[in-house]
UniProtKB/Swiss-Prot annotation:
Keyword terms, alphabetized: Secreted, Toxin
GO MF annotations in UniProt: toxin activity
Record protein name field: Toxin OcyKTx3
Organism: Opisthacanthus cayaporum (South American scorpion)
Predominant subcellular localization, coarse grouping: secreted
Example of a GO cellular component annotation carried by this entry: extracellular region
Entry's localization field: Secreted
Amino acid sequence: SCKRECSGSKRQK
């Protein structure tokens, strides 16, 4: 589960 930190490049859902 990714939050705002993973918005775009670091998308690790």
